[in-house]
């Protein structure tokens, strides 16, 4: 089955421009939502979050996606959402859409009727992720510079 594995789906994808690694000193502290949009929901006991990098008209969307695609891993999802730590996480990468779909198996227990989560259908989960502060290369999000904190993912 697919549970617990990591998957990528690439169909007729042109070679993407890849973002280089940047030194920590050139990173800015921003909410994840400054980089991506998100929509989330449920499918049985699994929570589903779709992230996408929008086109902002500055020509950096492909580079932002390249950085985000290398940054977002199952372990990073667990860092951003600690209650997902013991759960299976699948990542489905959709480069043509500059999007990544994340499935967190078992986050909702056996489903909406049997979970005690405050957000039983995971409708707010995408915004919960978008509110988390991350270190982003400052040249990908211009004019944002906050002092870095040690407790940032």
Give residue ranges: language-model regions.
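C-terminal amphipathic alpha-helical interaction region
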Residues: 1-47, 111, 116-153
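C-terminal non-catalytic interaction/assembly regions of soluble proteins
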Residues: 1-23, 27-30, 43, 47, ...
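Generic detector of well-ordered alpha-helical segments enriched in charged/polar residues
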Residues: 33, 65-69, 78, 130
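Short, conserved charged micro-motifs
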Residues: 57-69, 110-115
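Membrane-embedded alpha-helical signal segments
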Residues: 90, 97, 107-108, 119-121
């Amino acid at each position: 089955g697919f549970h617990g594995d990591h998957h990528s789906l690439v169909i007729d994808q042109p070679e993407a421009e890849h973002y280089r690694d940047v030194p920590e000193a050139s990173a800015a502290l921003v909410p994840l939502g400054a980089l991506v949009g998100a929509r989330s929901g449920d499918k049985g006991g699994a929570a589903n979050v779709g992230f996408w990098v929008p086109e902002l008209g500055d020509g950096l969307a492909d580079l932002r996606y390249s950085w985000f695609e290398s940054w977002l891993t199952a372990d990073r999802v667990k860092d951003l959402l600690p209650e997902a730590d013991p759960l299976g996480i699948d990542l489905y990468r959709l480069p043509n859409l500059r999007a990544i779909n994340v499935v967190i198996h078992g986050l909702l227990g056996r489903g909406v009727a049997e979970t005690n989560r405050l957000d039983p259908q995971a409708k707010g989960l995408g915004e919960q992720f978008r509110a988390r502060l991350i270190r982003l290369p400052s040249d990908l999000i211009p004019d944002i510079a906050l002092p870095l904190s040690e407790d940032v993912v």
